[in-house]
Amino acid sequence: MRICNLLNRNRIKHWITQIFALALLVAATSAQDGQPPVAAPVRPPLPPLPAPMALPKPGPTNDAPYVPQPILPGGVVVPLYPPGSPLLKMERIREAEQYNMSQAVPGRISSIVNIHNPSIEVHTVDGGLNTGAAIILAAGGGHNTLNVGGESADFVPFFYNYGVNTIILRNRLRRDGYSPKIDAVNDALQAIRLVRAYAREWRIDPNKIGIMGFSAGAELSSPAAILFDEFDRTNSAPADPLSGVSSRPDFVGIIYPGPTPFVRGASPPIPRNAPPAFITCAGAGDRVHAIWANEYFAAMLQAGIPNVEMHIYGNGRHPGDTLSDGSRMTSGLTDRNAIPFGTWQYRFIDWFRDLGFLQKPGIETKASKEITAFLSQPPPGSGRGGGGNRGATNSQANPVGAAPKAATPANP
């Protein structure tokens, strides 16, 4: 024990000696330079940061119907219905939308509620890049909010890179007293008609207009694929400025969908010119939405509709789900920690390019040609073959590849 204590004392003395020697060396060096030891400089404080600029905000309210403001710079906002439309609630038309802003990113609108004057916000592409294709984005949110941040606004620059024009749909919500199956679906179909009516002004190919819905938004895009005839017949009054303009989408995107028209074995009639569809969802981690996705796919496959593609990923969760660490699953374009489900948007681009939607405007797409070929086949039950198309009807409100009837644009 005595030996250990002696060794420890010797070590301490050695360290003290070394420190003292180093201090003498520093002092000697400073004396040789004729300068006192230099202290660390004291910097002045940084100037305060400026406040964020050009933050989006709801439009003013007055005696006129509320006019929505753009979510992103440069957006052209057009109300879906003219003032006085019977499809609007006149007692609420003047109410302002309410924005839920991101707490971390200044100016980022995460979601919107209190939508009573539904609208589209159009973002076009420069002429040299423009393919003429246009995608209407229907965000999710459980019909309680409209998650326009991750499931609409983020896609504008993404699709711009591929020459695709982007339209953000602000549809009405169940939380504000509207029916998702009636009012919101009407908003989606009206949006398709409105974009088609203004196609020339926005340099959009009228035969390359589709809709992509996310979660609750897919409860708009999936019925839009089969209900366009009924909507056009119902809204064909001569006084309607969009009468004669087809609401048929040229393609649909069904992304981690809510219930489709084929939920629990339902079998509504499927028009034989139903559009091609791209469907994606996580699998076991989002089982119920994957089942709904598969119901839509199976119905279209049974009907023989061309170019319906589905990707069900083994790993992934539904956007908004709470994880074990307390974080929430993100939506839209996020790469989801580099799992394959985080690349679904590139699989959509592969499908979209394969069907000819990324060609220059005015060139008939492969999708259109293959639907035309399908329509030339005998319908099911005709006694001339063509079996396996259970549920398909002969509806052709807007023959594929034909330009829609011209209409006087609405006066928003």
Put a short name on every predicted segment.
Residues 124, 148-167, 297-298:
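Short amphipathic alpha-helix adjacent to the substrate-entry channel of hydrolases
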Residues 147-148, 154-155, 169-203, 337-340:
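Catalytic nucleophile-loop/oxyanion-hole region of alpha/beta-hydrolase
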Residues 131-140:
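Short beta-strand element of the alpha/beta-hydrolase
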Residues 279-281:
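Short beta-strand/loop motif that positions the catalytic acidic residue
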Residues 186-273, 370-371:
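Primarily recognizes the serine-hydrolase "nucleophile elbow" in alpha/beta-hydrolase
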Residues 44, 50-130:
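N-terminal cap/lid segment of alpha/beta-hydrolase-fold proteins
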Residues 286-295:
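Conserved alpha/beta-hydrolase "acid-adjacent" motif
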Residues 301-412:
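C-terminal catalytic histidine-bearing segment of alpha/beta-hydrolase fold enzymes
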